[in-house]
Structures are given as C-alpha cells and as structure tokens.
Amino acid sequence: MIVLVVNSGSSSIKYQLLDMDNEKVLCKGLAERIGIPGSRIVHKKAGEKFIVEKPMPNHDEALKIVLEVLKDEKLGAIKDFKEIDAVGHRVVHGGEKFSGSVLIDDEVIKAIEEFSYLAPLHNPPNLMGIKAIMKLLPGVPNIGVFDTAFHAKMPEKAYLYAIPYEFYEKYKIRRYGFHGTSHRYVSKRTAEILGLDYNKAKIVTVHLGNGASIAAVKNGKSVDTSMGFTPLEGLVMGTRSGDLDPSIVTFLMEKEGLSAEEVYTILNKKSGVLGLSKNFSSDMRDIEDKALENDPLCRLVLDIYEYRIAKYIGAYAAAMNGVDAISFTAGVGENSPITREEICVNYLSFLGIKIDKEKNNVKGEERIISTPDSKVKVLVVPTNEELMIARDTKEIIEKGLKQLEY
C-alpha cells in the first residue's frame, strides 16, 4: 500500500510518500514560501536532494506541483497517481470529538472547521491541504490524524482547569495537549525496545523541539501532558513562556499599555529561551554552546530549561504512581547529550536513574542511555510522526474503519 502523508502549514507543506508494505520512505520533501515570492520545493529521494523552484500562490497549486514531483521520472517514485492508495493528513486540533484517527468525510471537515477557533493558526491550513488533495486526487481516501487525539481521553482531573465550570460548558476551555502523534509513537517504540507490555507500562515521553511537551503514558493511554488549552502551557520553549502566573498578563497590559493580543504575542513569540537570553537565540544549540563557554546568562537559561523539564518528569512519575522508562525525542531531546545528562543526574537520581555517559553521547539515534542497573530506563527514541500517520492510514483503510481508537 502506497500512502502519501501531508502536513499542511500556513506557508509550507511537508510531504512524505511511503510504501507501507515495508514501511519504506520512497521520497519526501517540503514545499515552502507558499503565497510568498521565491516559493520552492526541497525534495529528497534516495539520499539525494533536489530543488524545484516554481510559483506557488496557494495550497492547491503547491500540492499540484508536489504531485507532479512525485510522478516525475527522475525525482518521483510513482508512474501514475492511481498508485497512491490513501492520503494521511496531520490535523492539529480535534477538540473533544476525535480521540482517534478518522476517515475524512464532509462531516469530519465540518467538525475540523468548528474546532478552528481552538487552533486558528493551524486548523485552517490543515483544511486547505485536505480540500486541495480531495480535488487533485478524487476518489482517494483521506485520513485525519490529530495532534490532540492521543490526549483526548485524559481523565477529567487532568484536563479541567479550576475556573468556573460554565466556561468549560460554553467554550470547551480545558487542557487538550499537543504532539500526541509523537508521544504515541515514542511511547509505543519505547515499550518495544524494552520488551515491555505497552498496555501495562508507565512511560514518560519528553518531546523537546522548538515547541516542547511531556506526556505521562500509563497502560498505553496518555493520562496527562504538559501543554494545555493551547501549546503555550508547560515547559520553557524556544519562544514560548510555558507555565506562568496568569495575573502577569493583566499586569503587563496595565503597566506597558498593551492589548491582550500584544501580550499573547509576547508570550508566544518573544518569551521562552529567546526572551530569557535577552533575544540572543531561541535555539538551544546556541544556548548550550555559550553555556559551555561559561556565559552566565546562557548557563542560567539552560538551568531554567532543564529544571522545568525535571519538575514535570517528577510530577508525572507521581501521576502514574511510578515510572518504568523515560524517553527523550525531537530536536533537542534527540541531539543534546548535555541536556539529557544534566536533567537525569542533577534531579532524577532519587528515582534510581543512572546514566551511562558513553551511551548518552549519541545524537539522533535510537538507544538506551541508562546503565543496566538503572531502576528506571532512559532512552533516546527519534520520533517519526509521518510513519505513525501512515500506519493509522493503512489500518483504517485495511480494516474499513471510520475511526481508529488508540
């Protein structure tokens, strides 16, 4: 079965074509600068990189060009569009309705549109991608895989905010969580690597990219996660503040004469690592390099970043009444030995965690980095959201399902 995976953003579209009989990536790429001058496709096939420069005024045109590339004699991997059996789409917000991946029909599209008020930056471009593919590949089934779905069945005690209950009833203000596809892939893979029964294991997954979140996965279900109503809650991120006292918002509005929208932009785009480092960088690689050169501010930023992560891991060990494994993933999680080591050694030794320095000296590679006698296993598990989306797509098509429950 050939599956095309599409992740449609506001000005870019990531795509991957997979042969699901052997889970092999046939080719992949990124259409960037959609609707902006200088639009192009960066395409990869068999380790080779190709640049296709073409005007892409909108998502329809961008995906049309992507499909042409997939069929191209030199760049592509198929001879005819009929070879594409299904398309899997990343959709950011599924609200409370979707707790699993779904076969997309008019009703599902309507629901995604309804949830757009919860993810105004993400759901509309996700929908543009879905609608464009439906036009370009009529008759090919489309599957929606939601970032929120894995967390949708968190218990009420984990997802409700302690604000008047009517706001939950009126506006569905609650904790939703994000990065669900990544947390699901990494937790499942962790259980496989360790030979644990996924449905009986207690796993903490630590997704550290420019956006970052942690999940507590107990018996194969997400029981808590650090992001909330929006991806602003939780950890210190590249440009997001993470947890803070909400009264800071009204305080800044008053003292700086700012609108709610302006404060929101500050907390989302100008805070986190970027804000703490006095606008030096939002990239943890830059912060780490300077911290290792004994720059006091960058050392402090790294300390704050790690401290917040360690607190959440400790909290989730309590939430699950124990922990079998902790897995680091995404850009920073996969590629920063120092962050992993400092979190585990400085804060988590009380859990009986011991890190093997040599094994931890790994970047972007699947590996157990704890010692054999470590009571809790610590791993690096590179995430693979596209594969997870493709697997869900295959399962729904093969089993003739409308919705796949996790």
Swiss-Prot record:
It comes from the Bacteria. It catalyses: acetate + ATP = acetyl phosphate + ADP. Its EC number is 2.7.2.1. This is Acetate kinase. Homodimer. Pathway: Metabolic intermediate biosynthesis; acetyl-CoA biosynthesis; acetyl-CoA from acetate: step 1/2. Coiled coil: none annotated. InterPro entries: Ac/propionate_kinase, Aliphatic_acid_kin_short-chain, Aliphatic_acid_kinase_CS, ATPase_NBD. It comes from Thermosipho melanesiensis (strain DSM 12029 / CIP 104789 / BI429). It is found in: Cytoplasm. Mg(2+) binds at residues 7, 385. SUPFAM superfamilies: Actin-like ATPase domain. The lineage of its organism: Bacteria, Thermotogati, Thermotogota, Thermotogae, Thermotogales. The active site is at 147 (proton donor/acceptor).
